Amino acid sequence: MARLSFVSLLSLSLLFGQQAVRAQDYPTAVTLDCKEAMNKLRKAAGLPAFEDAVGDTFVLPAYSHEESRAAPVAETLWKTEICPKVLGGGRSRNVTEAVKLTGNFAYYPVTDGKKECSDAVEYWKGGLSQFNDTIPPTFQALNDPVVYNDRAVSFVALYNPKTSPVVSCVLLQCPNAGVGGRRLAAGTTDAVICLTNPAPLEARSQPFDDEQWKKIVDSLSLSEEEEEKGGVSPVVPSVALISAAVISAFALF
């Protein structure tokens, strides 16, 4: 009986160990509430506050492997379609879930363990530099014109000027894996991703009018002046932040 019990316990231990290893091969997506950090900047620029997004096409779903049976759509979205791009791979050939989402994305590649909403917002507002002090031009598509890279698109998503704007955010953690699922290194590559609606970027349109743009620029200039007076250096994204896991926020899909 004692031997049977020992064997049973050993088998159970191995089973849990295998399950833990398998769980490490799957991403997790934890819902974040970034409204306060985002709305602080938006209020200073005279823009309406973000509210919580509602509805499958507007909400980024939470996900963990333990609950994957109840969330097959979320597993496909994060594991198959989004994480490969976060890890620097190519676009999935069969994209079925990401294309169902609407809106524009703000994407922040986490570095140095800084994964709070405030860290993401500081990174996104740094996208102002992409426009070289001029109002964003007419948008056609990602990188058309060339100024609309991932940093610029994230900036526009943060300052979404549309009426009744909503936002949904997650902290996505993608397991570091290679081709065929081989683990390249322990740990995860993380990103804060927010989806804002209605989409501020539309083909053949400028995202901001002159008045909106002036208020945004003035609010950021005032913010920097206040930080300097308080002895705090304005946050400037590091080279590591700019280069880490660079993907197109607008064309995640």
UniProtKB/Swiss-Prot annotation:
The TA4 antigen is composed of a 17 kDa and a 8 kDa chain, linked by a disulfide bond. Residues 182-184 form a propeptide. It comes from the Eukaryota. This is Sporulated oocyst TA4 antigen. Keywords: Disulfide bond, Signal. Residues 1-23 form the signal peptide. It holds the Pfam family Surface_antigen. InterPro entries: Surface_antigen.
